[in-house]
Regions:
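Gly/Thr-rich phosphate-binding beta-strand-loop-beta motif of the actin/hexokinase/Hsp70
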Residues: 1-24, 106-136, 175-182
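Small-residue (GG/TT-enriched) beta-loop-alpha framework at ligand/catalytic clefts
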Residues: 78, 83-164, 197, 210, ...
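Phosphate-binding glycine-rich/basic clefts of nucleotide- and phosphate-handling proteins
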Residues: 130-206, 238, 244, 307-321
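Glycine-rich phosphate-binding/hydrolytic loop that grips phosphoryl groups
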Residues: 94-105, 150-151, 255-311
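Glycine-rich phosphate-binding loops at beta-strand->alpha-helix junctions
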Residues: 67-76, 220-247
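Adenine-nucleotide phosphate-binding core of ATP-dependent small-molecule kinases
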Residues: 39-52, 186-226
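Short beta-strand-loop/turn "lid" adjacent to the catalytic site in phosphate-handling enzymes
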Residues: 56-86, 173-174, 185-189, 194, ...
Length: 350
């Protein structure tokens, strides 16, 4: 049977699975997660993951027949291609790999289009995809809601309880709340303890979640197409609170894979071409209603734009204020750049 190495590239690093080309839904023969170092380029963890997996396969006398990598932008694709040199690596647009895996597993509903809600450590990407043509109708990205933002809020919540935690520890506690309802954190220096519950996390993230629901509605209004489902992707989608909250706010059927952060890596296995250095891009459809409002209908307008700016400013100010009110001694000194204000970027349909 043919062994394929599937890799997904993201802001937090790379995830890779080694599996048979016709069995990406089963437990992989091997998997690895390579975090991205502070300041490192996106291609570094990707190549590290590929090297580790290939070396491990050789040690087991296994032959990797192909390698495919997902990317979110053309800039990342070009960087990975340049760093890989002569290596035969297929590069695939991430939404295409996600759709292919969902269709393969039967999770993709029989509908004209779906919303891909991909929430990772650095932000939220919302893509309205046409299921009949595997094309992008519209895509937008927001950094108002992110895994890193969640971690900052958890860290602040622990500091209020007298527990000093670094970013990695805060993330571990936040991720633990996807499985447990209550997490007890301990300060290794003082012995102090603080309890964080799922309800605490839901309260901290409520404003960002409401913003993301508005974000989804804005994307669907631009295309003029009603999606048949909301597909939750990315590691943050493991949170039961997030899934329940979005179901109530958006009112669409929820599609969820038990390992949402590995959907891209598994899906790209199905798209490996076995051709030298293939590049699989997702086409973009020209949707008339996405370029201009329908007759008699106004576009998003100034009110919605102002509302989005207000939410962004409020969330940014809230986090900054919360962190600023803490005694500086409650926070460990760490390297790296200071967090930047929340930004909204748009990937328009041409």
């Amino acid at each position: 049977m043919v062994l394929i190495l599937g890799v997904s590239a993201g802001a937090a690093g790379a995830r890779a699975v080694l599996t048979h080309s016709d069995q990406p839904h089963l437990s992989p023969l091997d998997r690895v997660r390579v975090p991205r170092r502070a300041g490192a380029p996106v291609e570094e963890p990707v190549l590290t993951a590929i090297h580790r997996m290939r070396e491990a396969a050789l040690g087991r006398d296994e032959c990797v027949s192909g390698t495919a990598v997902t990317c979110r932008s053309e800039l990342h694709a070009e960087a990975i291609r340049a760093a890989a040199g002569q290596s035969d690596i297929d590069i695939v647009d991430e939404p295409l790999a996600q759709l292919r895996y969902l269709r393969f597993t039967g999770l993709l509903p029989d509908t004209d289009s779906v919303i891909l809600y991909d929430l990772g450590c650095s932000g939220l990407t919302v893509t309205h995809a046409d299921c009949r043509t595997d094309a992008i109708l519209a895509s937008r990205r927001s950094t108002v809601l992110s895994g890193d933002g969640y971690d900052t809020l958890v860290r602040w919540r622990l500091a209020r309880g007298g527990v000093d935690a670094d970013t990695r520890t805060s993330r571990a506690h936040r991720e633990a709340l996807s499985e447990a309802r209550v997490v007890t954190a301990t300060d290794t220096d003082t012995g102090g303890r603080a309890v964080v519950t799922r309800s605490d996390l839901a309260e901290l993230c409520a404003a960002g979640l409401r913003h993301s629901a508005s974000f989804v509605r804005q994307v669907t209004e631009e295309t003029g197409r009603h999606p048949g489902a909301l597909v939750l992707l990315g590691g943050c989608s493991r949170s039961p609170n997030l899934r329940a909250g979005l179901a109530g706010l958006i009112g669409l059927p929820i599609v969820y894979d038990p390992e949402p952060d590995y959907v891209s890596a598994r899906g790209v296995v199905l798209l490996a071409t076995h051709r030298p250095s293939a590049r699989l891009r997702m086409p973009r459809l020209r949707v008339g209603s996405a370029a201009a409002p329908r007759a008699g209908q106004q576009g998003p307008g100034r009110r919605k734009l102002l509302a989005a700016v207000a939410v962004t400013a409020t969330l940014g100010g809230t986090v900054a204020g919360l962190l600023g009110t803490q005694d500086s001694s409650a926070w460990p000194r760490e390297g790296g750049t200071a967090p930047t204000p929340a930004q909204l970027t748009e990937d328009s349909v041409n």
